[in-house]
Amino acid sequence: MVSVSVMGAGSWGTTLAKVFSDAGNAVTLWARREELASTIRDSHENRDYLPGITLPESLQVTSSATEALEGAAIVVLAIPSQALRGNLAEWKETIPQDATLVSLAKGIEKGTHLRMSEVIAEVTEADPSRIAVLSGPNLAREIAEGQPAATVIACPDENRAKLVQAAVAAPYFRPYTNTDVVGTEIGGACKNVIALACGISHGYGLGENTNASLITRGLAEIARLGATLGADAKTFSGLAGMGDLVATCSSPLSRNRSFGERLGQGESLEKAREATNGQVAEGVISSQSIFDLATKLGVEMPITQAVYGVCHRDMKVTDMIVALMGRSKKAE
């Protein structure tokens, strides 16, 4: 048993807190709002983000970051990618010095083009060997319901990866390890953009051939970007690559796919946001930062470019289709 702090009480953070608890650890979940923390403490349910799921009575919940982080051996960072830097700056002096930091965020930081593990290292000044990434085909509600799933723990330090692996292994949750942090993060960040494309396609009324083509060619451009950044090619055929991509592109539980469907049906970004309680899918923001990074590195990512066009340049879906189908002929 280890002491685990989960910083962030959204659907995924709450789910991972449940998994760590079910695996027999002492877990504290941090919620920014005391109102939410109090509700979870009293009802053992996160009605805002994970309604209908009963949380373990052993799970501690607080709105005090200092209280949540005290004595933690594993600190799970369940914070959206573009908010991670600001939160870490607040917690920097409170995070235990030798704790393993586990990133759940899937994105590339706007402006800096940094991966989330790089943001963590820069802000906290933690050695990269202390920073792990958890990623895979992990739709929160299915896991919270106890449906079997697998994931990847990527960390340069294999012993730390194994520590997290042992701590998060539950009867319904099987973690694997690798050392390819770059590939694991690139797969997780880019799949949100491809899922938006699949959602747009579905919302527009297109079928499974289109969906399969977007997933397959989407994986190809993700792997191109990963290779340029030094990732291991094998990562993209594994859980953090193809596994995560298929789940996110195919499931109605995927926020990115669902948001894309609304765009495909002709809704504006603002209307789609209103329909999702003011939340913008991660892929909308990531499409810009990933497109900018790809452009900077000279990596061809046509699907990402098209999604960026729809989300940020008022491109019509019909023009997106023409742009992708009208590209020059080439070998696969």
Swiss-Prot record:
UniProt keywords (A-Z) are:
Cytoplasm, Lipid biosynthesis, Lipid metabolism, NAD, NADP, Nucleotide-binding, Oxidoreductase, Phospholipid biosynthesis, Phospholipid metabolism
Q: Which organism is it from?
A: Corynebacterium glutamicum (strain ATCC 13032 / DSM 20300 / JCM 1318 / BCRC 11384 / CCUG 27702 / LMG 3730 / NBRC 12168 / NCIMB 10025 / NRRL B-2784 / 534)
Positions binding sn-glycerol 3-phosphate in this chain are K106, G136, K191, D244, S254, R255, N256
Q: What class of enzyme is it?
A: oxidoreductase
Family assignment from sequence similarity: Belongs to the NAD-dependent glycerol-3-phosphate dehydrogenase family.
Which sites bind NADPH?
S11, W12, R32, R33, K106, A140, R255, V280, E282
Q: In which pathway does it act?
A: Membrane lipid metabolism; glycerophospholipid metabolism
What are its GO cellular component terms?
Answer: cytosol
**Which PROSITE patterns does this entry report, sorted A to Z?**
NAD_G3PDH
Q: Lineage of the native species?
A: Bacteria, Bacillati, Actinomycetota, Actinomycetes, Mycobacteriales
Superkingdom: Bacteria
The GO terms describing molecular function are: glycerol-3-phosphate dehydrogenase [NAD(P)+] activity; NAD binding
The active-site annotation reads K191
Please give a single GO biological process term from the UniProt record. Answer: glycerol-3-phosphate biosynthetic process
- Name by which UniProt lists this protein: Glycerol-3-phosphate dehydrogenase [NAD(P)+]
Function, as annotated: Catalyzes the reduction of the glycolytic intermediate dihydroxyacetone phosphate (DHAP) to sn-glycerol 3-phosphate (G3P), the key precursor for phospholipid synthesis.
Q: Which reaction does it catalyse?
A: sn-glycerol 3-phosphate + NAD(+) = dihydroxyacetone phosphate + NADH + H(+); sn-glycerol 3-phosphate + NADP(+) = dihydroxyacetone phosphate + NADPH + H(+)
- EC numbers listed for it are 1.1.1.94
First-listed, main subcellular location of the protein, grouped into a coarse class: cytoplasm
Query: Where is this protein found?
Result: Cytoplasm
